[in-house]
Amino acid sequence: MTLLKRISSPALLALALFGGAAHAALVPPQGYYEGIEKLKTGDGNFRCEAAPKPYTGALQFRSKYEGSDKARATLNVASEKAFRKSTEDITTLEKGVSKMVGQYMRDGRPAQLDCTLAWLGTWARADALLSTDYNHTGKSMRKWALGSMSGSWLRLKFSHSQPLAAHQAEAEVIEKWFARLAEQTVRDWSDLPLEKINNHSYWAAWSVMATAVATDRRDLFDWAVKEYKVGANQVDDQGFLPNEIKRKQRALAYHNYALPPLAMIASFAQANGVDLRKENNFALQRLGEGVLAGARDPSQFKARTGEKQDMKDLKVDSKYAWLEPWCELYHCVGDTLQRKHGMQPFNSFRLGGDLTRVYDPNAESKK
């Protein structure tokens, strides 16, 4: 099937038409080629749970900020509870796949791989998460889930242990589903006005980038790079993102939340010969440095927003998982490197699992 025949979005069609000559196959950063850490014998008491029920309904979910003002910074406890319940099966899939892939890449037990494939295959055959009846929270769940699944899948697909070699038919079913989800994600998040482009768009672009590499789709890769550039050019001279500053007391937390997808996209682009580090005068570096400074002293964020910053998320080590790709891109030294080492290992299911294993495998694990 040709590239143009596969495309069902005007945004992707334009990129395909003007994308230029043929390219080499897309690849992930080097760490994704790592093999199984140490083959274990026996079942290790691993038990494959039944796959969560595939979510095929309308992607209409309540927002945890329901009833908040335009800053969208005040949590609605009742709405969050309803959101968690209605999305429980999706989140169970995301976390379960990430965990099982991590276990398999550590121990190499076939049951761990078989269970992962069974879960993903069940959802793929049900055409789960593909509803076009969605609200903002619904399309957000779609791209978060896709990034989680594709991010984990990359560790299986590119590992030199070749775990998928004996499962090619099932892998094809799953990857075709990923591609359809990515195409819908492109439709969901394309052509937004600049004032509406924020961390959600960056996370959408990460999910599309991960899927692009998993399925070798240059059109998806180009879309993710394009969205990255929009995000990078939103970073101002002081390292602030105006649309995240709007989050008032949670502005610093949302700047930190914007970094993981941007850093991952830049890292994947770099692996494919596209250097995004200098975009908008090193915007990604500026953004990261601003967040690290703000985590130590949030006064600049308070001055910019007029609000004392909510620091709860900034005290959670895993929220800094972006440091792994970011430090590879910008060669961290000194205090930043020490802070990274102090917080390792970084495990983020929305980024596909154990990023320290991928980017800094020689780091001493503290767990």
UniProtKB/Swiss-Prot annotation:
Keywords: Lyase, Periplasm, Signal
Biological process annotations from GO: alginic acid catabolic process
The protein's Enzyme Commission number: 4.2.2.3
Main location class: periplasm
Any matching Pfam family: Alginate_lyase
Reactions accelerated catalytically: Eliminative cleavage of alginate to give oligosaccharides with 4-deoxy-alpha-L-erythro-hex-4-enuronosyl groups at their non-reducing ends and beta-D-mannuronate at their reducing end
Subcellular location: Periplasm
Signal peptide: 1-24
Binding site for substrate: 63-64, 136-137, 254
Enzyme class: lyase
Residues passing through the membrane, by range: none
GO cellular component, one term: periplasmic space
Gene Ontology molecular function: poly(beta-D-mannuronate) lyase activity
Family under the similarity heading: Belongs to the polysaccharide lyase 5 family.
Function: Catalyzes the depolymerization of alginate by cleaving the beta-1,4 glycosidic bond between two adjacent sugar residues via a beta-elimination mechanism. May serve to degrade mislocalized alginate that is trapped in the periplasmic space.
The protein, known as: Alginate lyase
Annotated organism of origin: Pseudomonas putida (strain GB-1)
